[in-house]
Every structure is written in structure tokens, then in C-alpha cells.
Amino acid sequence: LRIYQAGALLKPCYLYLVFGNSLSESFLRYQNIAFVVVGSGDLSCFSESCRILHIKGTLSFSEVFNQIQQTFDRYSDWDSKLQLALGSIDPLNEMLEASLDIFHNPVFAHDTNFYILSSPRHVTGMSEWVHDQRTGRLIAPLSLIQDFKLDAEYQRTLITHGANIYSEELRGYRILYMNLWVSGNYQGRLCVDELQTEIQPGHFSALEYLGSFIELCIRRHNLFQ
């Protein structure tokens, strides 16, 4: 961690602390630099390549450093749980369970046929999964599957890579999603329903990080077969 000083050469290996009231368009020149912004400020002053941790409110230095340390601890603990889950007999459920406190929203995964592969938390407003009589597995309701097949926006989402947003037009709430690809083939989708808290910009990177572990599991364990 370093205190930001105007005019100093910034390095990607450091996290720079800056106060929101000192932000200006001059910050646009920085690329691939990580900042902690304390207090209110115009975050559009940063390039999209920069990583931003925004701490709102008026805090003392000790409070700021404590919040930064707590954030690092939370993500370090999450990473450790994802790593451990790689060797588990039930990696997908363990990974999604560990991710609930990162997204603060329900997280689930489904395959190409809308079979539910993992859904560790169900909250009010979510779709009610049903048991497929043929396979005995949980699956999205047939009516919802038909709605998706007829929805032009949903059809466009089937070719995307990385984390993206599916709008609230059909479901009544936004869904942060990431398609899962292995060897160029679509394997399913990882979803975060925006039902409990607002999706934050950092959740996009977090979902891609989680997705990379799940794609690795697919290769190792044939999870979606």
C-alpha cells in the first residue's frame, strides 16, 4: 500500500490510497493501476483498466487501513476456499457456497439444458426450480425456458464471454452472468441474481475469477456431463 503523490511514477504492484476530493481528469492517464479511493469523488476520472476499491464516508487513517485489511482478508479467504474445493468431491457446491459472502446475492449455475447444477441459497423472488420427472434432477421451469428461447436479448447473451449483465426486462431484476466455455464449447452459465444487494463493479471481476475455477473443474471432473 502506498499514499498517492501527484507526479510520482506509479507501479502496478502497489495499491495507492487517494482521497476522493483530490480526483481529477488527470487520473485518466494511469493504466492498470490499483487505487483505494476514500470519501466521495468522481470515479469516472479513472481509466477502465484501473482497479478501484471505494471506501465511502469520512474515516480516520486507522479505520481506512482496517477496512483495507479486512477486504484483503475476505478475498484471501475466498481464494483459499476455491483452491480447496478443486480437490473436493463436490467442488461446484463448495465454490458457490463460498461465494455467497462475496456477491451478497444468490448464486447458481446451470448447464446447456437449464438443469440446475448448484444453487446453495434460494431467496424470495428467485425462480422455483422443479424436479424433472425423467431425470429426477432440478431444472428451470419450462415456462421460463420458453421465455428465454423467445427473448432476443437472451439469445444475444449466448455468445458472450466474461461477466455481463442481463437486464431486468424479462425477470424483473438484473442478472450478472458468465457463460462457461471449455475448448470453445458452451457448457452452461454462472448467474448472480440482483435480489438482495446492488451488483457492484467489482463483482464483474469476481464472477470471472469464480468462473475460471469452475471451467477448470469442468475440465478435471466432467462436472456437466
What is the role of each PLM region?
Residues 1-225:
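Hydrophobic, helix-rich cores of sensory/ligand-binding and other regulatory modules
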